[in-house]
């Protein structure tokens, strides 16, 4: 056996008594093998004879990428988008969410998200639903935001009929048993505890900045169920909400990777004339309130000294988010605001996936590169059908909170100043790149189709959005920033807030020419 191994080793190495075998793999033989065989003299730039000519996608023929929309007799809209491949993503998007809970117990949308894909009239349990989807290689998910609830399934296109039937049952025929509600109560309670303990404060700060910006109205209502309401929400409360907001005229059945007519036929079969589990009484208690921006401050004092992701503790930080009202996604200024947000950019001290992303954005150049003690500085833009919020999140040591806030207010003031052509073009290119790369994903296309059709009854195609981005000029960015700076700020603060400036001082800084905070005088140091 040892002799065989030794022989094989020598053969592979080409040494010893087997050295002559190397001639078989020498340069002349290798060149003959790789010369092209039957096509030795045809350059790569010429087509091979007898080989079918490949057909490539062209940039023209936009009709192939148009979103088709059909409205059924009951008001439900069916939207579809072609995408090649054997899998599809189909779902139902509903115009409901936490912003519509003013007349209800806050937290209903959070409960419904956790209750999704539980037992229904046709399926006895969540396991049965998952087994049905597995036969078509499918997965399911439900997400709620402040203004939209989305039930989605990705599966083999051949199972479209089964998928739409399942979605209709999940949305319109949920059982909402006492056991399921109790299990959901525990899941919601756990998520609230996790929200308050997780090292990443961004979800909590986003909740707080909305609460400060829109005091007790529409998008300022709690997205997560308040602790005091967890025990109060039951089947009757859920049915009361569903009766008003889960109506066909507030729904869109969207699909990507499916034939439009097939999807419409499935919608007529499973979503037309269906009696929902909560009855078919008229929706009489719909909240049609328009968002009222108020500005203000939300503070949460907390010991952040023992927060860690593992054995290595994170430095004790104070987190600040300062925001101003922007505009709705239905307005023309939405695109300039999106470019402005990309121009501000920013990030953390450490970037996942390698350095280089946004390193020439303003918050990197002016903040993170110049102030080593700043742990994070990132710009965010939240936009809804009747309002919007552009904000900057910053983190630093509690002893440098005042200086950090002043740096952020200065950056807000600089937004209304001169816009360099190079940085604007870079931001526009980054925004276009991000848009197109995200839309390579089927679930993202599905969400884009569904949300646009739900909000506007049509869809702007990617090339139209790219044209709008290219047309943004420096004066457009300066105009929207100057308009934004005339409003009241919204402030969220988390951590050790001993040195946090007052709301009035922050407001004064944002109204000044240089963004400086008013000087404070102390009798005793």
Swiss-Prot record:
Ubiquitously expressed with highest expression in fetal tissues and adult brain, cerebellum and cerebellar vermis. The keyword Kinase does not apply. It comes from the Eukaryota. Its main location: mitochondrion. Residues 1-33 form a transit peptide. GO terms for cellular component: extracellular space; mitochondrial inner membrane; mitochondrial matrix; mitochondrial processing peptidase complex; mitochondrion. Signal peptide: none annotated. GO terms for molecular function: metal ion binding; metalloendopeptidase activity. Substrate recognition and binding subunit of the essential mitochondrial processing protease (MPP), which cleaves the mitochondrial sequence off newly imported precursors proteins. Belongs to the peptidase M16 family. Heterodimer of PMPCA (alpha) and PMPCB (beta) subunits, forming the mitochondrial processing protease (MPP) in which PMPCA is involved in substrate recognition and binding and PMPCB is the catalytic subunit. It is linked to Spinocerebellar ataxia, autosomal recessive, 2: A form of spinocerebellar ataxia, a clinically and genetically heterogeneous group of cerebellar disorders due to degeneration of the cerebellum with variable involvement of the brainstem and spinal cord. SCAR2 is characterized by onset of impaired motor development and ataxic gait in early childhood. Additional features often include loss of fine motor skills, dysarthria, nystagmus, cerebellar signs, and delayed cognitive development with intellectual disability. This is Mitochondrial-processing peptidase subunit alpha. It comes from Homo sapiens. The lineage of its organism: Eukaryota, Metazoa, Chordata, Craniata, Vertebrata.
